[in-house]
Amino acid sequence: MKTEMLYLSAPELLHAEARIVAISDRDDGAVAVAKGGGQPADSGWFELPDGRHIDVRNVIRDGEGIVWHVVDGLDPDVHVGAIVEAKVNRPSRYYNSQLHSAGEAVAAAVHFAGYAHWSVQTACHFPGQCRVVFNDHGTTKDLEVVATAIARQLEEMVQDDFPIRLAYAEDLDELNAVHRLEEGKHFAEWPVRLVSPKDGLS
């Protein structure tokens, strides 16, 4: 059974009741963000009905869409059918989200600084390793001029408290209606979360 990604529809949700579906450290609904999309996994814990905690060391999503919560051993009270409260470490979640949003802001700044033809090749939002790598398609002559223009654009966006919008697309038609895609771009699973400037990218 595919795990429902509760954090996609309600990113502010930091806890939810979950039912253990197998003694393999996975449940049927995940508020924890799994490692992926250039962002580290959430940290958190399962709270048992009697108030005891089981720390979650890692969160992994497998190829079948099942989210696995990796824990250090299982409590005897954790069994198939048991109900636990899955809780996310708030400071860690928001720090990782801020780093991810910063990467999105850099991509928007590149676009608005006049480099809309650049494409993102990869992005990493891990603490201490944050970066967005672009392909300029061989058009850049002076990197210092480009870096200055992008930095200036980013500063303006921050000073103006640049608004963003968050949307979800359930299929390719819906995605193309709200977002310009690169040729050949594809997604392994749906829904796709879109983060863009409030007025969109042309």
Residue ranges and their predicted role:
Residues 1-202:
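A glycine- and charged-residue-rich anion-binding loop/surface
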